[in-house]
Amino acid sequence: LEEILDEVMEAGDRALLFTQFAEWGKLLQDYLQRRWRSEVPFLSGSTSKSERQAMVDRFQEDPRGPQLFLLSLKAGGVGLNLTRASHVFHIDRWWNPAVENQATDRAYRIGQTNRVMVHKFITSGSVEEKIDRMIREKSRLAEDIIGSGEDWLGGLEMGQLKELVSLEDNQS
């Protein structure tokens, strides 16, 4: 993490760092601020609405604003536009890929002009590795069942489509 963040900082890029644990986020915030001697805001569920907006505005709009923005996965996963980021880090994995994808999407919004690199950290031989395997299997299963996007719907025959959208008479 440090090596990649060194590169991010040296390039003048900005990064989002997501963690699912608020307590870990506080520890990480303290460490990152000491390590790079710069502000690293931490947005969690306990962040007030006004503080939250101030953090987002400073990260997004201030040329001298923070390069690193630490967010709890749940609090930072929805309703934010953070297109200033060109890197997204998932520090610890969440079992539900949709939650991680929503968080990653904070950087992929209308107005994004940067290429965004997504980094997911996994400790070898740990529960995280097992969670990652589960996530990949769930994603593969979802892909096999419904396909990618809306393409699966176009592959249905007319009879299958009619059956899908028709009401059933269950009064027998």
Residue map of PLM features:
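ASCE P-loop NTPase motor core, strongest for the SF2 helicase catalytic module
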Residues: 1-172
